[in-house]
Design a protein with these regions (language model features):
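Beta-propeller domains with acidic blade repeats across secreted/periplasmic ectodomains
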Residues: 1-222
């Protein structure tokens, strides 16, 4: 294809799409399927976890907070903000239960509040594990409960300085003994220097009981 010549501009010649919700519309499903909103009005839903009894946990939150140290950061921040939602971060886990099977949640409760940008979720051996932007924590869970019965217990801290790519993905090994956490890079192309990339762009393998960890993979951007 014919590509335009490179141009240097103070402001990029681009249009940012205005963030809007679905409204009364729904995604178009293949023939024989329908799409129903299980719940609406969530505060920046990120990841979901289906619990053993079919209840659904939703992590709601927004993190980040890389400092604006250069003129470029101020300009880029202004442009990116145009595409951000105005919805406030939930910083919580919301539990949804569809008791009658009609596809709409009949029960909706705040399962756990006052979290720090929760993202990854996993359920292993009676505990719900939550990857916040700065720590891996857990709370005990008994099937059927709609609110956490204890304060989060820290398993291990997670790298969070600057936090350009803040989301922390989480999954468990088949036997449940190891938790894997994805830790994003602190830049796009190393523009902040390599010192801030220490223990970033990696996957950690974390012992579920002791919190001991090792680096499983490196060079993974986000």
């Amino acid at each position: 294809p014919d590509l335009p010549e490179i141009r240097e501009t103070l402001l990029p010649p681009m249009r940012i799409a205005k963030p809007v919700g679905w409204g009364d519309s729904v995604p178009q499903a293949p023939q024989g399927f329908t799409v129903t909103a299980l719940a609406t009005g969530l505060n920046i839903p990120r990841q979901m976890l289906v619990l053993p009894n079919g209840d659904v946990l939703v992590a709601e939150g927004r993190g980040g907070g890389a400092p604006r140290l250069r003129p470029k950061d101020v300009i880029a921040g202004f442009i990116k903000k145009q595409g951000n939602t105005k919805v406030e971060s939930g910083n919580r886990l919301t539990l949804l239960r569809d008791a009658n099977g009609d596809g709409v949640a009949d029960v909706r409760t705040v399962f756990l509040d006052s979290l720090n940008a929760p993202y990854g979720l996993a359920f292993v051996d009676g505990y719900i594990y939550i990857a916040e932007q700065d720590a891996l924590v857990r709370v005990p869970y008994v099937e059927g409960q709609t609110q956490a019965s204890a304060e989060p217990e820290e398993v291990t801290k997670l790298p969070s300085a600057l936090n350009h790519h803040w989301t922390k993905a989480l999954t468990a090994s088949a036997d449940g003994s190891t938790l894997y956490v994805g830790i994003g890079s602190n830049s796009n192309v190393g523009e902040r220097g390599m010192a801030v990339e220490e223990e970033r762009a990696v996957v950690w393998a974390i012992d579920r009981e002791t919190g001991a960890r090792r680096t499983l993979a490196r060079g993974i951007r986000n």
